Regions:
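Non-globular targeting/processing and membrane-anchoring segments
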Residues: 1-96
Length: 96
């Protein structure tokens, strides 16, 4: 429900992805917004890839907002979920 509530405030997914493609800079907020919309569109792996790219580029952006959002997605997916396990490892490898 948290992601659905967050997504209500955002532009539609196609619009966000178009803005992202045309953006010359690495717009982390736009990536975060798109990732939230991707989660609510059942495109979770794409969302995790996008968030991981933010963590890789600037771990501390907005007080680690991308990393914290990834953790919320892992919690949503549940323990033992293969996708969550894979991306948790990728995130851990970047951070350590």
């Amino acid at each position: 429900l948290e992601f659905i509530d967050m997504a209500k405030e955002l532009d539609d997914l196609d619009s966000l992805l178009t803005k992202l493609e045309s953006s010359k800079d690495d717009n982390y907020q736009l990536k975060l917004d798109a990732a939230i919309k991707l989660v609510t569109s059942d495109r979770v792996e794409e969302a995790l890839k996008m968030l991981l790219s933010i963590v890789q580029a600037d771990r501390m952006w907005e007080e680690e907002k991308a990393r914290k959002t990834m953790i919320k997605i892992f919690d949503l997916l549940g323990k033992g979920n293969e996708l969550a396990t894979r991306y948790r490892r990728k995130m851990f490898a970047l951070l350590h």
